[in-house]
Every structure is written in C-alpha cells, then in structure tokens.
Amino acid sequence: MIGWGDVYKVVAAMAPLYFALGLGYGSVRWWRLFTADQCDAVNRLVACFAVPFFAFDFAARIDPFALSYRVLAADALSKLAVALALAACAAAASTRCCGSGGGKRGGGGGFSWCITGFSLATLNNTLVVGVPLLDAMYGKWARDLIVQISVVQTIVYFPLLLLAFEVRRATTAAAAPPPPPTGTDDDDVEDGAAAAATAAAARRSLWPLVRAVWLKVARNPNVYAGVLGVAWACVTNRWHVETPSIIEGSVLIMSKTGVGLSMFSMGLFMALQDKIIVCGAGLTVLGMALRFVAGPAATAVGAFALGLRGDLLRLAIIQAALPQSITTFVFAKEYGLHAEILSTAVIFGTLASLPVLIVYYIVLGFIR
C-alpha cells in the first residue's frame, strides 16, 4: 500500500528539478538575464559537457555482467510493438490515400509520422528525470535499472532514430523530380536521363546512409560518453580495478551539474518560445496520449509477456511514462520534421509529468 510518505518522497525528488526549470524560465522571461545567444551557449555547455559527464558517471557504475536482460528485453519488445503498430497505421493510411487518388503523398507522410510517433511513445528522459525519480520511488536497484535502460537508449535507439531520419531524407531527395533539360537535343536528353538515373541509384545505396548516421553518432557526445562508460564498467568489473580518485573526482565535479543544468536549460528553452503549446490542441492531446498512455501500455504488455511482476513491472511502466526526451526534439529540429510537436511534448510533457507519474505510482501500488 502506497502511503503519503511515499508520495512525499516522489514530490521531494521532483521538486528540485522543477525549481531549476523555474529558475531558467524566470531568468529569461521575467528577469531578462540571458539573451537568445547566451541561452544557446548554455544549451551547448549542457549538451557537450554536463550531460555527457553525467551519462558517463552513471554508465561507469553499472555492472555489465549483471544486466537485467528481461527488463531490457521487455523495453525492446514494447518499442518493437509500437513500431509495428505505427507501420500498420501508416500502411492503412497510405492504402486509403491511394484508393482515393492521393497517390504518392501518403507513403512519405506516413513514414514521417511513424518517426514522430515512435519518438513520442518510446523515447523518454530516463537519465535527467528518471534517475532521481525512480531512486526516490524504489531505491538504488531501480536507479541502477533505469541507468541500464538509459545507456541502451543512448547507444542503440538514438542511432536507430538517426538512421530513420537519414532514410527519410534520402528517400525524399530521391523522390524529388529532376530538373528540366535545358536543350532539345536527343543526345542531351538521353544523357540527362542517364545521369538522373545514376544519381538516384547512388542516393538509394546503403553506404551513404550508413556513413551519414555514423558521422552523426560519432559527433554526439552522449553516445560516446555512454560507450566509454560501459567500456570502463567492463574493465572495473572484470578485473576489479578501482577508478583512481583523481579521475573519479574530475568526473564527479562535472557530473553533479548534469541534472540541474539540464533542467535549467529546458527552462531557458521554454522561455524563448512564444507559447507553451505551439502545435495546436489536437496534436498536443495526441502527443500526450502517445507519451503517457500508449507508451506505458505497450511497455506493460511487453513486460507482462516476459514475466515481469511486482516492483519490476511497476518500474517498467513508470519509466515508460517519464517526460519526453529532449534529444528527440533536437533531432526533429535538425531534420525539419514536426519540431513543433516535439517541442510541445518536451515542454508540456515535463510540466504535466509530475502529477501523471504520481498517479501511476499510486495506482500501480495496488497491483500485486
């Protein structure tokens, strides 16, 4: 049975996060302490230093030889179920579009919505919000599990999301009509057609996509911070090597800024927007439904199917209801795909997550 003391622990863990977010919001919206360029500099500091050190610190503390494979498999199964459901919806929409004369318009749009829907339903803020929250709810073992999920999300699912974005970009470029020929000579026309066919074939080849995704992943500090953290965890747990105190202290001094600066940066981002809801009420409701209902429901099915029960089942469901990952908005903005929807999901979802997560915590407390 969940008591008020347990609820207070959750609120006490979340309140400092909202305090940092409120300071960031007020420093721009009310006190005018930062300009837009200075906000970009703060965001850059967070993205390149604070969060990567935070991710490395927690990844280096896990035991790679004692991973909870059932929890990770349940998470993967739920993501696969969401991807298949979105693909089925896109195929059905494309079929209806073709049947009504919509033709080509349905396919590309369907794939775009699959990417956005997958981001909304499955990719959440596991590290910044999840670690302190689940530590308060269930203790150290829950914190260790959420770090495992976060590391897998960083080094597996984010690169896959980048791959999907690059595939969409390549297919969109390949589908673009070639420029009209400048001359009327038959040989010129044939040469132009051959060149267009060659260019299209090159665009469709796999290697440019793999290379583009690899470069994006290699430039992402969070990815190689997670990989380096796991590598160091393998060394320390395999050969029982202690991290030198000088290195541990150097990492910790930056890692401790990760949560606070991330929430502060999110507050800066919120203050720079004209309004919290920028994509309309309908899409906002859809995004919140995917974030707080569809994602946890898919995770519950996957976790139950793999035999998770008790606190493991509760943790799996609650981590799926965490706020939207900020990284998904960064990718959406970079690739120009529904950035306004992801922006609303990050801002409004973060504000709404506290009562939603408390409700999940209380309701799941009755499940045995």
Swiss-Prot record:
It is a multi-pass membrane protein. Pfam families: Mem_trans. It is found in: Membrane. The chain crosses the membrane at residues 7-27, 39-59, 71-91, 114-134, 145-165, 227-247, 251-271, 286-306, 312-332, 347-367. GO terms for cellular component: cell periphery; endoplasmic reticulum; plasma membrane. Expressed at low levels in roots and shoot apex. PANTHER family: AUXIN EFFLUX CARRIER COMPONENT 1B-RELATED (PTHR31752), AUXIN EFFLUX CARRIER COMPONENT 5B-RELATED (PTHR31752:SF15). May act as a component of the auxin efflux carrier. This is Probable auxin efflux carrier component 5b. It comes from Oryza sativa subsp. japonica.
